Amino acid sequence: MKKLAFSVLCALALATPAQAGEVFGGLYAHDVDTFLTKSGFEDGVDVQIGYRGERIGRTPLQPYVFGALNTSGETSYAAVGLSAKFGDRIFFRPGLGIAVHNGSAGNFQRTDKIAFGSRVLFEPEVGIGARLSDRATIEASWVHMSHAQLFGRQNPGIDNIGARLSWKL
């Protein structure tokens, strides 16, 4: 799994143009109970730090990589993927990636911890934000992780909701 995650990260880095992208960081409420999940077992705050590359060619797609560390010792993760920014002063940013986590990869239901069913998960996300200056943006975002029942019926998933600040390099 580590080799797969490293290979994907390297491929995204090579696909990124030579121009500088942006760094971002934020704070997220961890394991928010929503209609998409069957969890709500874990708590704490996630500290997220990442990098988003420039657009790929003439597409709106931008590669990203980030890590999220849970302050309560619960599930932390790293993700890579592609996002697209629509709009300028006010924008909408959907993204889709894969994540590797350090939580339980078990296939059985638990009442004390999320059993994700797989070490590698899909990581869709959505952000709505605003440009603060030529270099800075702020956005509210939702990050979901699950395996979409591809690796078994056990798929509680996890939702993290928060805000991040981006700074263009």
What are these language model-derived features?
Residues F41-V47, E74-A78, V120-P124, G157-I161:
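Residues that define the transmembrane beta-barrel architecture of outer-membrane proteins
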Residues E22-V23, I56-L61, I90-F92, D134-A140:
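Repeated loop/turn-to-beta-strand initiation elements of outer-membrane beta-barrel proteins
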Residues A130, G157-L169:
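Outer-membrane beta-barrel "beta-signal"
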Residues L9, Q48-G50, G81-S83, G127, ...:
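Outer-membrane beta-barrel architecture
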Residues M1-E22:
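Cleavable N-terminal export/targeting peptides
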Residues V23-D33, T59-T71, H144-S146:
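Transmembrane beta-strand segments that form the barrel wall of outer-membrane beta-barrel proteins
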Residues L27-E42, R93-E125, G129, A136-E139:
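Outer-membrane beta-barrel translocator/channel fold
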Residues T16, I49-G57, S83-D88, L132-D134, ...:
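Outer-membrane beta-barrel proteins
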